[in-house]
Regions:
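Glycine-rich phosphate/pyrophosphate-binding beta-alpha loops
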Residues: 148, 175-181, 256, 387-392
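Amphipathic, small/basic residue-rich leader segments at the start of a protein or domain
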Residues: 1-106, 123-127, 131-138, 150, ...
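N-terminal glycine-rich flavin-associated loop
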Residues: 42, 104-123, 149-152, 161-164
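A short core secondary-structure module
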Residues: 166-210
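C-terminal helix-coil-helix/basic helical segment that borders enzyme active sites and/or dimer interfaces
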Residues: 46-51, 308-351, 364-367, 464-467, ...
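Glycine-rich beta->alpha junctions and the first turn(s) of the following alpha-helix
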Residues: 20-23, 29-30, 97, 209-311, ...
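Alpha-helix capping/hinge segments and adjacent helical runs
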Residues: 2-4, 40, 68, 76, ...
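A gly/ser-rich beta-alpha-beta helix-loop segment of oxidoreductase catalytic cores
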Residues: 138-161
């Protein structure tokens, strides 16, 4: 299994990576089934979703369950398909034509269901997973509190064991709970003797209630409510994982959520580019389609480039997880693998959400004044996608996680930055190698390798200057994370170009040879 973050230490293109062109016919069929479901059953009622028509969203999710879209990652033994992350990625990508539905769908299949997949006991899995896979039960995830947003461990919800040791009594309030208005099952985090613990709480438990829907900037049709816990009696059998180890569940569930968010951003970005490309060829100004003008074509090109890199990044990460999970002996080992790829998960989340935000902004610009009006779908996309930079930990927090995690691993020796720093210092004196100078795209392989060295060198200089206090230098850490994030995206796109057999790529090769 490849170490998380080790892409910084490897030569670009030295190892094969999973690319979208390797999707199997079955995986492509899953994507097509998802796309057809959303286009035929969700998009036609998008105005009703936006108006928050009562009971519509849970009805659509249950229909998705009937079609089989909720069961991809649920084990076959629990009524699911037992598929991997690549399959889940293509499902997530194709669920994005309606923003509010996508949020509800991803919440249920991701942070709503997967905690039981990874940490549930056999009894918990048998009790809940079949119902979650079919849509009979719908799920939500309750971590955030009024005073515990980015600082999730500051939560004040508590759980006390009853004298007979049969129940925990939960008290507290969670906020911004996606799917909270209709969910049947919540993964709730509360402290037992000051230590974070996860619980499976059914909405039917006495003392569980929800507050009014939040009035949001976007994703109007998704449910976002406070969850109120008043002396809720939860059986000890509903403790998820170990008492006092809830932080592990919370953070690793967010790692899964970050990857899924990145996958969703791929689909939404594709949708926006398709809409915009169609519009600019239909919109006439100065006697021509505006799509004929260079500045508009440049916008389409910039969006397409960023999409190519994002798609490459997300599928490479999914492939890494599938490869790792295929050799895992049990759920505990899979959890360690999620933690191993925490850096890649944060990169997928930050890069994905910011690419989508860029493309949604360019879509508005290409539509001109019409893009600013709610008669055009790009206006809704612009509002809906803004929350992605807040979901699953803000992009600022994730930037700190990217560089902070890599520094911790370098300090502990998990990643051998010291040897690489020595190599870099030597190269500064003798010169940097040009191993691919004569190869097609070889120059870019060398450039990416140089940027990787730059990121490691900046980390080393930062540690030398600030020592242990480097974790307080947020501006530096964020800048390093941006270098790492962009480098990872460029490398993934480059590896895809080198591995793939794209007709356009082959044409470019022929043209280049003829010019010689």
């Amino acid at each position: 299994m490849q170490k998380g973050g080790s892409f910084l230490l490897s030569q670009t293109g030295s190892e094969p990576v999973f690319i979208p062109e390797q999707l199997t016919p079955d995986q492509k069929a899953l994507g097509e089934t998802t796309r057809e479901f959303v286009e035929k059953e969700v998009v036609p009622v998008s105005d009703k979703i936006e108006a928050q028509e009562k009971a519509l969203m849970p009805k659509l999710l249950k229909r998705a369950g009937e079609v089989g879209l909720l069961m991809a990652e649920v084990p076959e033994s629990c009524g699911g398909l037992g598929l991997g992350k690549v399959a889940s990625t293509i499902i997530a990508e194709n669920s994005t034509a309606e923003g509010s539905f996508q949020v509800a769908f991803m919440c249920h299949t991701g942070i709503g269901t997967l905690p039981i997949n990874y940490w549930g006991t056999e009894n918990q899995k048998k009790k809940y997973l079949p119902k979650l896979a079919s849509g009979e039960m719908l799920a939500a995830y309750a971590l955030t509190e009024a005073n515990a947003g980015s600082d999730a461990m500051a939560g004040k919800a508590i759980a006390k064991l009853t004298p007979d040791k049969k129940y925990y009594i939960l008290e507290g309030e969670k906020i911004f709970i996606t799917n909270g208005g209709f969910a049947d099952l919540f993964t709730v985090f509360a402290k037992v003797d000051g230590k974070m613990t996860a619980f499976l709480v059914e909405k039917s438990f006495e003392g569980v209630s929800t507050g009014p829907e939040e009035k949001k900037m976007g994703i109007h049709g998704s449910s976002t409510v406070p969850l109120i816990l008043q002396d809720v009696k939860v059986p000890v059998e509903n403790v998820l994982g170990e008492v006092g180890r809830g932080h592990k569940i919370a953070f690793n569930t967010l790692n899964v959520g970050r990857w899924k968010l990145g996958a969703g951003c791929v689909g939404a970005t594709k949708h926006l580019i398709k809409i915009s490309a169609k519009y600019v060829m239909e919109r006439q100004q100065f006697g021509h389609p505006i799509g004929n003008f260079e500045l508009i074509r440049e916008k389409i090109a910039d969006c397409a480039i960023k999409l190519y890199l994002l798609e490459s990044l997300v599928y490479r990460y999914a492939g890494l997880l599938d490869e790792a999970h295929s050799s895992a002996k049990d759920s505990a080992q899979k959890v360690k693998q999620l933690e191993e790829y925490a850096v890649e998960a944060s990169i997928a989340k930050v890069y994905g959400s910011e690419v989508l935000q860029f493309v949604s902004d360019e879509a508005i610009q290409m539509h001109g004044g019409y893009g600013f009006c709610d008669d055009y779908i790009v206006e809704r996309f612009y509002r809906d996608c803004r929350v992605n930079r807040i979901f699953e930990g803000t992009n600022e927090i994730n930037r700190l996680l990217i560089s902070g995690t890599l520094l911790k691993r370098a300090t502990s020796g998990e990643l051998d930055f010291m040897t690489e720093i020595g190599n870099i210092l030597g190269m500064l004196k003798s010169g940097f190698p040009k191993r691919n100078a004569g190869a097609l795209l070889g120059l870019w392989q060398d450039v990416v390798d140089q940027i990787k060295r730059l990121a490691i060198y900046v980390c080393a200089v930062g540690v030398q200057k600030y020592a242990e206090k480097i974790q307080e230098r947020q501006a530096l850490l964020a800048s390093v994370s941006d270098i790492i994030k962009e480098t990872n995206a460029i490398e993934d796109g480059l590896c895809r170009a080198l591995q793939g057999k794209n007709p356009l790529h082959e044409t470019f090769v022929k043209v280049k040879k003829k010019k010689k």
